[in-house]
Structure formats: C-alpha cells, structure tokens
C-alpha cells in the first residue's frame, strides 16, 4: 500500500509539472512574416481621405469597435485641449490611441490578433481584416508622435515589457526580429513587471512613441511600439521559469505590405525602411544560444542580419 500511495503521489506530481510546462507555451521570436505590417508610406494622405467612411462601415459590422470608438471620442473631447500635438495630428489619431489603451474591454486584443494573423495575403486582409481604419489611424498616430528619423534624432526610448502567459525565446543571438503587433511597453520597469514575468523584455526602441499623455491609463507611462520595427536580439537568459530577452532596435522598419487598402499587394520580402543616419548593412554572423546561460552581445559591435528573405 505504501508503494502504491507513493506511485500515486509521484504520478500526480508529474502531471502537475507537465501541466505547468504546457500552461506557458514557448513561442519563437522571428520576423513574423504573416503579420499585417503596412506603414502606409507615400499614401497616408489618400488613406486619411478614405479612412473616415471605412471606419463607419467597420463600426456598423463590429459592435465593440463602435462602442469603444464612441466612448473614446467623448474622452478625447475632454483631453484634447490639455495637449500639445504635432502638426497633422487629428482627432481620429488620438481617439485610436484611447481605444487601444482601454484595456477594460478586449478590443486591443482582437486588433492584435488580427494584426498577427492578417498578413497572409492582400486578399486575406481585404476580406477578413476587421480593423482597417483603426490600424491606419493607430499606425499614423505613432508616426506623427514619434516624428521621422528614428534614433538619428535622439537615443530612442529604453523600455520594458512584462508578459505573464507566454515564453518568448529567440532562436539565436544576432537574429533580427519584429514583435509583429502593436506592443505596449513602459519606461518604468516596476509598471512592466506588474503585467507578468513569464517573459520580461528589455528594449531600446527607435519608432515606439510615448503615449502617456493620450492613454486611458497615463500612470502606466506607456511607449507603444509599431508591428514593423526591426530589432536585434542582443541578450537572452532564463531565470527559473522566467525568460529575459534584450532587444535593441536597429533603427529600421520593414514591411511586406504598403498601401494594401489602395491596391498594394504583399511583397515576397520584408522591404526595409532605414532611418536617416543608420549604419551600413550588417553581417549575418551570429552566436548560438546555450541553454540555461546568459548571453549578451554589444549592439555597437554586432551588425544585424538582413531583415528580409
């Protein structure tokens, strides 16, 4: 009986350990080629003309989008007069940020789910992507708030991001990766850790925009990173159940799509857009990850592998 009881206990412990492992999936960091990554280069004015009607059509089909947008419009009307905004920044851009940062509903999650999976083809985007106007307004808001030039205009933002439900791991140091969605981060490490520790990111972003003044939750001191920014993996370690990832922006974006709503087809490669003053094209040399050890690369001494296939 003692042996049977012991075997039963061991069996339960094994099942519990297996459940814990499966409860936090491991996802590889990559260039996520199926992300819808349009940056609307050269067509932002035409998209501004079309996005208003497009938004009305999409709100008619999506109740949560309509409710969230209308609530954010009201909040923006009270917030707007307190803000100093860049030239070209319109009410729709501010409302889009307030819609995204309102985590009291699931719309931000639904948007990012669509972004991560909606870039298989232009046909897929046109038929099934339900947030075309919101994606445009949010992308444009970040471009206007951040300004052109990336880190050639300044050192960028050092930010942190905590994830509680997923383990993200790079394949190797020196890889180029994208986050593949609109990614919330904070300049305050303590704030970021409140969102989880399964994976903890340390990042330097050149295209993420500080949105604290526009956010529904300004105390989070948020910097919002666009889906198409390219990062260099400079560090990875595991501390028990926690993965710690260090990403250093290469001061570059890349996109498979450009002006898709206006007819632009998906391109085979991820076409890079370099910021002014960016270093020359990088070497493909990289170091392999070693399990259980902390590996770090000095981003000033390592060049990035090509962003597109």
From Swiss-Prot:
Which positions, given as ranges, span the membrane? none
Q: In which tissues is it expressed?
A: Abundantly expressed in testis. Lower levels in cardiac and skeletal muscle.
Catalyses which reaction(s) = L-arginyl-[protein] + NAD(+) = N(omega)-(ADP-D-ribosyl)-L-arginyl-[protein] + nicotinamide + H(+)
Q: Which GO terms describe its molecular function?
A: NAD+ nucleosidase activity; NAD+-protein-arginine ADP-ribosyltransferase activity; nucleotidyltransferase activity
S-S bridge residues: 43-259
Annotated catalytic residues: 161, 184, 222
How is this protein named in the record? Ecto-ADP-ribosyltransferase 5
Q: Answer yes or no on keyword Hydrolase.
A: no
Q: Which EC number(s) are documented for this chain?
A: 2.4.2.31
Q: Where does NAD(+) bind?
A: 100, 161, 181, 215
Q: Name one GO cellular component term.
A: extracellular region
InterPro entries found in the cross-reference section: ADP-ribosyltransferase_ARG, ART
Query: Family per UniProt?
Result: Belongs to the Arg-specific ADP-ribosyltransferase family.
One of its Pfam families is ART
Provide the top EC class. transferase
Subcellular localization, as worded in the UniProt entry: Secreted; Membrane
PANTHER family referenced in this protein's UniProt entry, alphabetically: ADP-RIBOSYLTRANSFERASE, ECTO-ADP-RIBOSYLTRANSFERASE 5
- Leader sequence segment: 1-23
Which superkingdom is the protein from?
Eukaryota
Residue intervals of the TR mART core domain: 63-253
So which residues have sugars stuck on them?
102, 197
Q: Alphabetically list the UniProt keywords.
A: Disulfide bond, Glycoprotein, Glycosyltransferase, Membrane, NAD, NADP, Nucleotidyltransferase, Secreted, Signal, Transferase
